[in-house]
Amino acid sequence: MIWKRHLTLDELNATSQNTLVAHLGIVYTHLGDDVLEAEMPVDARTHQPFGLLHGGASAALAETLGSMAGYLMTRDGQCVVGTELNATHHRAVSQGKVRGVCLPLHLGRQNQSWEITLFDEQGRRCCTCRLGTAVMG
């Protein structure tokens, strides 16, 4: 297991209360040895005007996952902040849920890179993101 902080899924989800994460309905669903996953509904909260998943909502899910994964890689007195987010949208989604899977690309002392892939309910890749974070403290 790569994580330096050991939180349960319930503890991770509790951090989202009264935030954008809760408003968008994002829920952490799996914490593995080197992976963090979450789901987000595709509904009125996350649609763009034409009834499809908004790219900004996809980016918010990606940054949520990457930032929390980055936090799990810090020690007491440290935190992470996002420095760069890139998203490539592959497929439109209009309903259901999307699942985000976050894996590390680089874990340095001062910066990290995370790959976050979003899948629709049929398991098809709909978005690929990369998040860079800086370790503070």
From Swiss-Prot:
Subcellular location(s) per record: Cytoplasm
Keywords, ordered alphabetically: Cytoplasm, Hydrolase
Main localization of the protein described in the UniProt heading: cytoplasm
Active site: E63 (nucleophile or proton acceptor)
Pathway named in the protein's UniProt entry: Siderophore biosynthesis; enterobactin biosynthesis
GO cellular component: a single term: cytosol
GO MF entry, a single one: 1,4-dihydroxy-2-naphthoyl-CoA thioesterase activity
Pfam family for this entry, one: 4HBT
EC number, as in UniProt: 3.1.2.-
Principal EC category: hydrolase
Gene Ontology BP annotations: enterobactin biosynthetic process
Keyword Cytoplasm recorded: yes
Domain of life: Bacteria
CDD domains: PaaI_thioesterase
Record-linked InterPro entries: HotDog_dom_sf (IPR029069), PAAI_dom (IPR003736), Thioesterase_EntH (IPR026576), Thioestr_dom (IPR006683)
Known partners and oligomeric status: Homotetramer. Dimer of dimers. Interacts specifically with the aryl carrier protein (ArCP) domain of EntB.
NCBIfam families in alphabetical order: PRK10254.1, unchar_dom_1
UniProt family annotation: Belongs to the thioesterase PaaI family.
Known role: Required for optimal enterobactin synthesis. Acts as a proofreading enzyme that prevents EntB misacylation by hydrolyzing the thioester bound existing between EntB and wrongly charged molecules.
Name of protein: Proofreading thioesterase EntH
Organism: Salmonella paratyphi A (strain AKU_12601)
Lineage: Bacteria, Pseudomonadati, Pseudomonadota, Gammaproteobacteria, Enterobacterales
Gene that produces this protein: entH
